A protein has these predicted regions:
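Bacterial N-terminal signal peptides that target proteins for export
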Residues: 1-8
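Bacterial N-terminal signal peptides
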Residues: 8-17
Length: 118
């Protein structure tokens, strides 16, 4: 049986390919709404109110995932039901988008910057 290949481009300069069979093991409902390369060997896949942390070098999800988006896992990201998109801007900041709003996230501090969403 021939396997389909899914190619995902997200974040800055991030390209990943895998068979759909392997993608099903990692992405909560197989329809990610946000995918971002965090720049530290990890990528995050968001789907609905959940996300997984993916280890690029080992080509697999980290143990214990998926997890829910909440105040403990993503401080300051208020959209517990999910996001529309996310991008690592390459300057230590990531941007989460939902509807017409966005949140700037400080990657090093691991929390949203004050004054968001905008």
């Amino acid at each position: 049986m021939k396997k389909n290949t899914l190619i995902v481009i997200a974040g800055l300069f991030f390209l990943m390919a895998w068979t759909t069979a392997s993608a099903e093991r990692y992405v909560p409902d197989q329809h990610p709404t946000g995918i971002v390369n965090w720049g530290n060997g990890k990528a995050y896949f968001f789907s609905g109110g959940q996300y997984i942390r993916y280890d690029i070098a080992s080509d697999k999800a980290d143990p214990g995932y998926p997890k829910n988006i909440n105040a403990e896992t993503w401080p300051g990201v208020i959209w517990m039901d999910g996001i529309d998109a996310v991008v690592n801007w390459g300057n230590g900041k990531a941007y989460f988008f939902k509807g017409g709003q966005y949140i700037r996230y400080d990657i090093k501090a691991d929390k949203a910057d004050p004054g968001y969403p905008k």
